[in-house]
Regions:
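Radical SAM/AdoMet-radical enzyme domain recognition
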Residues: 1-98
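Flexible glycine/acidic-rich beta-alpha junction loops that bind and position SAM and/or redox cofactors
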Residues: 16-21, 77-113, 136-148, 180-185
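Generic recognition of stable, solvent-exposed alpha-helical segments in well-folded globular domains
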Residues: 33-36, 60, 64, 115-122, ...
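C-terminal accessory region of radical SAM enzymes
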Residues: 110-147, 178-222
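Short, small/polar residue-rich loop motifs at catalytic or cofactor-binding pockets
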Residues: 158-161
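Radical SAM enzyme core and accessory elements
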Residues: 170-172, 181-184, 189, 213-290
Length: 290
């Protein structure tokens, strides 16, 4: 608290949702321990945010999910992360498929594009009427940032990436925490400095790939500016023209951007006029009542 640290807590909604997949190493539910940690942070006045994974199970209950964070936890900073993983039998013994592997099968817990789109739209409709400027949902804030031409603050919605490397316990450094595979290893902190690795040609190429590998369908899309193809790890589908590199969640993101476009346009006007984007709430209520 003294140093203004913001602590990220992994919690996937109410107990029923969280405990579906969040087990400890003994296979036991972890909800109560997570809540104990949250209550400890609250007791000492430490700012925290929720990092919530959206999966095949909890995605069907968007309002229960959101209202738990808002009404029960009074959590003002929320990150929603859609879980999309492919599984395969790699020669190195790993189960998760990297982007370079084409034979991975979608894991059963992965969210569908339709679920993701419905999840985001449903929560946005609740948020835009009541909570703008009070409860901050990272994806909504980042979408508005892209709408007004600012940096989105998260790599998945940026034009280029490569600034979020990860270090393992043994000092190995990888290009991204979604790409912890041998083929994306940059080196080890005991042999190279972070500066060397982060500004290496390999990492520069990795970051530029986010935009340079987009299929034509994305480049022609009216919402390309809003998502920039999202995270490269999810780009394992073929475009309508048969090009590789289409994001698995494309349909869901398109549904979301198309749904929120009028509200984002309004907030953009308010922002550029140096007024509060939260004014959208009154406008949204009037729009709904017409």
């Amino acid at each position: 608290r003294e140093n203004n640290f913001l602590v990220g807590i992994s919690i996937d909604g109410p107990q029923e949702f969280h405990d579906e997949y969040r087990k400890n190493k003994m296979g036991q539910p972890s909800f109560y321990k997570v809540m104990k940690g949250i209550n400890l942070l609250k007791k000492h006045g430490v700012e925290w945010n929720a990092m919530a994974v959206v999966n095949d199970y909890n995605a069907d209950y968007p309002l229960d999910f959101y209202r738990f964070f808002r009404d029960e936890l009074d959590c003002h900073y929320i990150q929603f992360t859609p879980i999309v993983e492919r599984l395969s039998n790699r020669a190195d013994g790993l189960r998760l498929s990297s982007l370079k592997q084409k034979d991975g099968e979608l894991a059963s817990f992965s969210i569908t594009p339709e679920q993701w789109g419905n999840f985001l739209c449903t929560i946005f409709d609740e948020w835009v009427l009541n909570d703008v400027g009070n409860y901050y949902i990272q994806l909504f804030d980042s979408t508005l940032a892209n709408w007004v031409g600012q940096q989105p603050g998260i790599c998945s919605l940026a034009k280029y990436c490569g600034h979020a490397a990860v270090m393992e316990f043994n000092g190995d450094v990888y290009a991204c925490d979604h790409f912890v595979f041998p083929e994306y290893k940059l080196g080890n902190i005991y042999q190279k400095t972070l500066v060397e690795m982060m500004y290496s040609k390999e990492q520069e190429t990795f970051g530029a790939m986010k935009h340079n590998s987009l299929p034509q369908q994305c480049l022609n899309c009216s919402y390309e500016f809003a998502c920039h193809g999202e995270c490269p790890k999810n780009r394992f589908m073929l475009s309508k023209d048969g090009e590789p590199g289409l994001n698995y969640l494309c349909k869901g993101y398109y549904q979301f951007f198309d749904h929120v476009a009028p509200y984002m346009d309004f907030m953009k006007k308010e922002y550029l006029a140096e007024r509060a984007p939260a004014n959208v709430m009154e406008w949204a209520r009037e729009r709904r009542n017409k």
